[in-house]
Regions:
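N-terminal signal-anchor/first transmembrane alpha helix
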Residues: 12-26
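Transmembrane alpha-helices and their membrane-interface boundaries in multi-pass membrane transporters
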Residues: 27-35
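Juxtamembrane non-transmembrane "cap" segments at the membrane-aqueous interface
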Residues: 35-42
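Short clusters of hydrophobic/aromatic residues that line enzyme substrate/ligand-binding pockets
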Residues: 47, 52
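Alpha-helical transmembrane segments of integral membrane proteins
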Residues: 1-13, 29, 42, 46, ...
Length: 198
């Protein structure tokens, strides 16, 4: 969405994408989760409101149960990525060297994929790594709303029952995920922009 908005700034697509992205950033995940449960599950009865199914037992049911929690967790991240990508791409596409590439006869698609996205990818990897960390924290609340037996509900149950080894184990697992994601993001940034290695 951010790429589409950046290609034609100030058009109706850009304004629509910006409005949706602003809403996605502004709405808290737990509130969006409750709206999804009330409207899509209880009112329309399209998807299940609570629980989770194993993918090995029933792939279709597993997808149906994971859809609403996935939307609730990912909405903020998708909106933030769209906003940041739009802003970064607008800056790159309005730069002098992009005008030179246009003058040389390169198509907009080629400029976008070979030059534009490459230049904004460092920002993109950094934002995504930060959003993964935020999503880990959001799972605690989202799992409570959808009654999903996951790491978030496990750490809450462990804290309530004062089961400190469980809490330490979950925190340790989350720390490993955060470190791994940040390391991968740093390696990708260094691969895209060799100046970062120096």
């Amino acid at each position: 969405m951010g790429v589409i908005a950046a290609i034609k700034p100030n058009g109706w697509v850009d304004k629509t994408v910006s409005m949706i992205a602003s809403l996605g950033v502004a709405i808290p995940g737990f509130w969006l989760a409750m709206i999804l449960v009330a409207e899509i599950s209880l009112k329309l009865n399209w998807l299940p409101a609570t629980g989770a199914k194993s993918f090995s037992v029933s792939p279709w049911e597993a997808i149906r149960h994971a859809l609403l929690p996935g939307i609730a967790i990912a909405a903020y991240g998708m909106a933030e990525v769209a906003r940041q990508l739009r802003g970064s791409l607008l800056e790159v596409l309005s730069s002098q060297y992009v005008r030179t590439l246009h003058a040389k006869g390169l198509s907009m698609t080629r400029i976008l994929w070979q030059h534009g996205l490459k230049n904004v990818s460092v920002n993109l990897f950094t934002i995504i790594s930060l959003l993964v960390n935020r999503m880990l924290a959001a799972t605690v609340v989202i799992e409570a709303v959808f009654a999903i037996p996951g790491m978030g509900s496990l750490i809450v149950r462990g804290a309530i029952q004062r089961d400190f080894p469980i809490v330490q184990g979950v925190v340790f697992a989350m720390v490993i995920v955060v470190i791994a994601v940040n390391l991968i993001a740093d390696l990708l940034c260094a691969a895209v922009d060799p100046r970062i290695e120096q």
